[in-house]
A protein has these predicted regions:
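C-terminal and inter-domain tail/linker signature
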Residues: 1-320
Length: 320
């Protein structure tokens, strides 16, 4: 771990420790210690570039959800100490909506929301981050439909205006695994995006899929239905695999992280269309991060982080 404090033995430990200190321990000022400045943080609906924006965003979230926890479900690692490591960190956050903020007046309701953060880490700091949080799960938990929340945010912001994120730091090269299981999975998702049959992927008969809004699918048919509905409504013009990593061993199933981006048109020509309302023809960008567990080449569990609220914001902008 060249350039990191001696206490950190590997990337997994580094991510767990700084998460515990900053967010679990409420040592918010430590963000300035463990994040570079500038540091680009991209979400499906926003791009920030300074460490102070990370600090202020964290404080705002805690004001709205003061009992928020960040419980690590998994960390899938790649990269090296020269070009930079990348941690793909899946978290589940139990929390209660107790304060005013971007989700409106406090409802007092309990929320469980999943997030995946892909962080480039170099010289003891997070230097670039891609983050997808399941905003639709928060909305539904507090009694708001994702479409309604999207409209509220559009009204407050004056419309959809996400800037283009800057490139990752010099010297960092996104990891694209050459392992056969990783390539097969990424290739299958890209094939789905272009109209292929999701049933062709080697899903286990009892696959467990968790998608946007915290929705759960069981089995091959329901899981394939999710992909058909998504890409049937948003017709893909281009699909890019941005990061692909496979971790094996440790007595566990193989674990895979895939970050992808699709440029689409909201056309809704499929019989499964309707997920985002009547077609508008509007260009819509999907920024997704998937985590997968595989055993003997079959997908046992699949987590798909896509921000439905950000997608609705793009669709509703067209209607406005």
């Amino acid at each position: 771990m060249k350039g990191f404090d001696p206490e950190f033995q590997d990337l997994d430990q580094y991510i767990r420790v700084i998460t515990a200190r900053i967010w679990e321990g409420r040592r918010i000022d430590d963000i300035r210690r463990y994040y570079s400045d500038p540091c680009t943080v991209e979400t499906p609906s926003s791009v920030s570039t300074t460490v102070e924006e990370v600090v202020s965003g964290t404080r705002a979230t805690l004001a709205t959800f003061p009992d928020r926890r960040l419980l690590a479900e998994d960390i899938i690692v790649s990269g090296d100490e020269d070009g930079g490591f990348l941690s793909s960190h899946r978290l589940i956050s139990p929390m209660t909506h107790l304060g005013d903020g971007e989700f409106g007046a406090p409802s007092g309701r309990k929320v469980h929301v999943r997030t995946i953060a892909d962080c480039v880490c170099k010289d003891n700091r997070v230097v670039h981050e891609w983050l997808v949080r399941d905003e639709a799960a928060i909305a539904r938990a507090i009694g708001i439909e994702p479409r309604a929340l999207a409209q509220t945010w559009l009204d407050q912001s004056g419309g959809w205006d996400k800037p283009v994120a800057g490139p990752a730091p010099s010297g960092y090269r996104s990891h694209i695994s050459s392992a056969a299981p990783a390539r097969a999975y990424a290739g299958a998702i890209e094939d789905f995006a272009h109209g292929g049959n999701p049933a062709a992927l080697a899903y286990d008969e009892a696959v467990h899929h968790i998608g946007p809004g915290g929705a759960t699918c069981y089995g091959r048919d329901e899981t394939a239905g999710f992909w058909r509905a998504l890409f049937g409504t948003l017709r893909v013009k281009s699909f890019t695999v941005e990061h692909l990593a496979l971790n094996s061993g440790g007595g566990r199933a193989d674990r895979l992280a895939l970050r992808w981006r699709a440029q689409t048109l909201h056309q809704g020509e499929s019989p499964d269309a309707g997920r985002y309302g009547p077609a508008t023809g509007r260009p819509v960008e999907i920024m997704g991060i998937n985590h997968v567990e595989l055993l003997h080449g079959k997908v046992l569990r699949e987590w798909v982080l896509v921000d439905d609220v950000a997608l609705w914001m793009q669709v509703l902008t067209a209607r406005a």
